[in-house]
Amino acid sequence: NMTNHSYFNLNGHKSGSVLHHRMQLLSDAFTPADAQSIPTGEVCSVDGTPMDFRSTKELGAEIDAAYEPLILGNGYDHNWVLKNEGRFDKVAEVTGDESGIVMEVWTDRPGVQVYTANFLENEAGRNGAVYQKRDAVCLETQNYPDAVHQKNFPEAICKKGETYDTKTAYRFHIE
């Protein structure tokens, strides 16, 4: 499952927590994982849960809710099921609360893993920065994790002789 793991803080270098960043995801469902972060095989609706980012809200609005998937992940570290049906389309938008920098995520992949840097602790950065828990967010476009073991997940195997071709773009502007 090829993806990337770029960390973003749209308020800028050394600006601390991303919990006030605002995010919208074009997704009605997510794939919960167990305590070892392995998907359970379920596809669950985001409706009425802290996983619902169909309308823009702050990353920190419900990140510490007493909701099992968030407790197991120590925050957001989940795959959302995208509605793009394999088309290259805008699937997410994140806005820095202080900077007004907007990052749009476009992809043809069926999923996006959102990770809120739940396990960063005293991570050395450039120019003397020290990154802490939730100082960044990752939006990792991908196939569903563990798809090879989950019969109800979309096929994710690239067979000999086949070409793997995918496109993801991160577009930035100021609001």
PLM segments and residue spans:
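An exposed, glycine/acidic-rich loop-and-rim segment of catalytic or binding clefts
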Residues: 1-175
